[in-house]
C-alpha cells in the first residue's frame, strides 16, 4: 500500500498490471536505490549507464532539473523495464483498481543498426559484422539491421516496446540506433569526440555527413568496452558549457529525449525544434 496525495494506492497482486511472477522478480531486484520510484512525483526509467549519467545533466541544462521537479531516475535493464512500468498501471479487470498518480517516462533504444555500420570490404565506417543464421534458421543478427526490416516490422517492434503504455506511463524510443548514437547525430558530435579523445582538433577529420559521423563516433564508443562510462562522465562535464543557454542546447538534442524530460517535468517554452 502506498500513499500519494493523501490517498492510498494498493499495489498488491490484483491491483496493478503486474503478473504473479513480476512480483517475485521485483521483490528480488527492487533494492533501496529503486525504492524511491514509488515516492517521486515523476519517474524516468532508463536502461544504460550513459542515460543514468547524462539525463540529469541534460535536464538541468534545459532548465528542468529532475531534483526540482521531484523526478527519480531509475536504471533497469531492457528485459525488466516493462516489469517496472507495469507497477504504475492499474488492473483493468479490478473494479477498484487505480493507477499510481506518477508520470513515468520509459527511455529505450530503437536498437536497429544502419547499413553504414556493417563491417565489410570497401566500407571504412563499418565495425559490426552481419551474421547469417545457421542451417536451422537460428542465430545470426539479421533482425537487427534496419534495412532488413520492413516498416510494418519496425512499427511492430516499437509497439512491443511500448506495450504497457497507458494511463500515466509513456515510452520514448530513440530516433535512431541508441541513446549515444542519437546524441552524436543530432548535435553533440564535437562534444562526444572531445570526451573520447580529450581534444577537439581531430573532429575535422570526421565525416561531414551527420549520420556517418555518428557511426564513426559510436564505433569509437563501442571500442571503449567497459570504459564507456568514463566517456559519459567526461561528456557530462563538457556539455556544462551550455549552462544558461537552454534554447541553444535544446537544438542539439534528439527530440525523444526532450519530450521525455518535458513529460515528467513541464513543457519547455515554444521554440522551433527540428523533428528527427
For every predicted segment, state its role.
Residues 1-276:
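Acidic, divalent-metal-binding catalytic cores of TOPRIM
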